[in-house]
Amino acid sequence: LAAVSVDCSEYPKPDCAAEDRPLCGSDNKTYGNKCNFCNAVVESNGTLTLSHFGKC
């Protein structure tokens, strides 16, 4: 089973587009899109990971 991951190397970004492509984080919180999720990953110092694509 391959780990689900997203490349957050280009983040953080100051502004996120309002695209609706939800991701579920390891904190059981739904993030609206990759940008919002990756900003949160950076803020968490890498402790936040992707649980799965789609809403939690």
UniProtKB/Swiss-Prot annotation:
Superkingdom of this protein's organism: Eukaryota
Annotated localization: Secreted
Keyword Secreted: yes
Sites where a glycan is attached: 45
GO cellular component: extracellular space
GO molecular function terms listed in the Swiss-Prot or TrEMBL record: serine-type endopeptidase inhibitor activity
Site feature location: Reactive bond 3: 18-19
Domain named Kazal-like: residues: 6-56
Disulfide bridge partners, by residue number: 8-38, 16-35, 24-56
Primary residence: secreted
Record-linked Gene3D superfamilies: 3.30.60.30
The entry's keywords: Disulfide bond, Glycoprotein, Protease inhibitor, Repeat, Secreted, Serine protease inhibitor
Pfam family, one: Kazal_1
Entry remark concerning the domains of this protein: Avian ovomucoid consists of three homologous, tandem Kazal family inhibitory domains.
Name of protein: Ovomucoid
Upper lineage: Eukaryota, Metazoa, Chordata, Craniata, Vertebrata
